[in-house]
Regions:
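Extended recognition/assembly regions associated with phosphoester-bond processing machinery
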Residues: 1-520
């Protein structure tokens, strides 16, 4: 699943999910969490932007959200039989991309949203992979993939995407970096609530015959990731604004497009960075002569080129990636597709035939996690993420850690992911209903503790009872003023969204407060 799965265990988890109160539903995940129901098939998912983020945060490195339902964590690579699967959770926001994971319970209103913004450090780990993967999954689409499919068909049913498309702000920079590095046979995403297929032919790009449009977002990538003020909050896409209609790939006939669902309510009442002024005549400038007299410390630091698209390493040889996004679940919607996937990754030895495959750790990925474990900080907005030192720095470190993984985990036969799910938070109590006050406490997940112990890395997610209680008594940090409700139509958890791109009353007046049922 590519999500939003909304892995809500109880009513308090709903208070940590970026969905307006009047649209919240408990759903049925809690039944799988409690064991009342079981999934018929192994299910793997990444996180999106409508999640019980406090629950998924317990499983930052990946783990079982419920029996048979495996969350990939913020970023991950796992194996399932002959397949090697990479995943990246969250959605793009240039403002938060290079920040640390500063959110920690109890959350303020801005934390509830920023916690699911993908971070550069997590993306950086994926960019160290040097061998082929078969499948990549993300919630947000990789930026630029829209140019490789039926773009006109997409814009016919999602016309509000055109502004972001023309300004190079559509979709995820992080997912594109991962896609271009990993080049899997398949990449699956969700987020826009529409079926869309595309093909990325890297052989054309290497020969210089690729689409010129692919280069357009690349410049914007560097602008988004290097500037502290993004033009707007790029991840907040009008998913339901025009009603949800499946869009076909280039090969599909146009008559399969259905009329829009006018009764559907948009839930992405998210923060938007204010559009910058187009004119900057009032900003004072400094002459180059005066700049030359300043000490070297006043010079602008060189741009970080680590996000530049580099040639793939020899171990990544696939040239064709098939991209597929599906609609959200619902009647007469294209939300399910069955595919036969032929592995393109190489294995040192063929796996013996098995009736059922079990998830396994990935040797290279575990080595990467050991290299980067000390760089992870939690709950501190003032912390600085260590800079990207580039592949030449990380490669020998990763190779050394691979030798450790081989000796300590591969050879002893410890690479199968244990089915060690345990309840942490209480299960849902229907007698209490869903409108409960307060946020849940923080839980130290035994799966994360076991994983960190296995890898012999620090576990910053574990806190003593005294630390948890002290944070709860202190309460949330002061809120970011961008998220204080009432100052404009999209503020906080208040207001509706109109069909126009305007702010304030236009957005709130057109769709807000109509009492329509929310469709996920």
């Amino acid at each position: 699943m590519l999500n939003d799965s909304q892995a809500v265990r109880n009513a308090q988890d709903l208070n940590c999910m970026a969905v307006p109160v009047k649209y919240r539903q408990i759903g049925d995940f809690h039944e799988y969490y409690s064991g009342a129901r079981t999934v018929p098939y192994l299910t793997i998912f990444v996180g999106g932007n409508h999640e019980a983020s406090n629950h998924l945060w317990e499983l930052y490195y990946g783990g079982w959200a419920a029996p048979g339902i495996y969350y990939m964590g913020s970023a991950n690579v796992v194996r399932l039989g002959p397949l090697r699967i990479a995943g990246l959770s969250g959605i793009w926001n240039g403002r938060d991309y290079k920040k640390p994971h500063f959110e920690r319970l109890p959350y303020n209103s801005s934390d509830v949203r920023s916690i699911y913004h993908v971070r550069e450090l997590d993306t950086r780990k994926l960019l160290q992979i040097r061998t082929q993967v078969d499948i990549g999954i993300s919630h947000d689409w990789p930026r630029g993939v829209e140019w490789q499919g039926d773009l006109r068909g997409l814009l016919r049913v999602k016309p509000y995407l055109e502004d972001d498309l023309n300004n190079g702000r559509l979709n995820s920079v992080a997912a594109k970096l991962a896609l271009d590095r990993l080049r899997p046979a398949y990449w699956f995403s969700a987020h826009h609530h529409v079926k869309f297929a595309a093909t990325i032919d890297y052989s054309k790009e290497e020969n210089g015959s690729g689409s010129q449009k692919q280069a357009v977002p690349e410049e914007q990538h560097r602008t988004d990731t290097q500037q502290g003020t993004a033009t707007k909050n790029e991840e907040e896409i009008d998913l339901d604004l025009d009603g949800e209609v499946p869009v076909t790939s280039q090969a599909a006939p146009p008559e399969t497009l259905k009329s829009s669902n006018a009764d559907e309510i948009n839930l992405d009442l998210e923060d938007e960075d204010e559009e910058p002024s187009q004119a900057h005549d009032d900003i004072p400038t400094v002459s180059e002569d005066l700049r030359a007299q300043l000490p070297a410390a006043f010079s602008r630091p060189p741009a970080n080129t680590s996000t530049e698209q580099l040639p793939p390493p020899p171990g990544i040889a696939n040239k064709l990636t098939r991209f597929l996004a599906l609609d959200k679940c619902g009647a007469n919607r294209s939300f399910l597709q069955i595919l036969d996937v032929k592995p393109v990754s190489q294995h040192s030895a063929p796996a013996p035939p098995q009736k059922f495959f079990r998830l396994e750790y990935d040797k290279e990925w575990l080595a990467i996690l050991r290299v980067f474990a000390a760089d992870l900080t939690l709950g501190d907005p003032s912390a600085q993420v260590p800079p990207d030192r580039g592949p030449a720095h990380y490669l020998p470190l990763i190779e050394a850690e691979e030798a450790w993984v081989e000796a300590n985990l591969v050879q002893p036969g410890k690479m199968v992911i244990p089915e060690n799910f345990e309840l942490t938070a209480p299960v849902y109590d229907p007698t209490m209903g869903i409108n409960v006050q307060g946020q849940p406490r923080e839980y130290s997940n035994p799966q994360t503790r076991a994983f960190c112990k296995m890898l012999q890395i620090p576990n910053p997610f574990h806190a003593t009872e005294e630390e948890v209680q002290a944070r709860m008594q202190a309460g949330p940090r002061p809120d970011d003023p961008r998220f204080e409700g009432g100052h404009r139509g999209r503020g906080g958890f208040h207001g509706g969204r109109g069909r126009t791109r305007g702010r304030g009353g236009n957005r709130g007046g057109n769709r807000g407060g109509q009492g329509r049922a929310w469709q996920r």
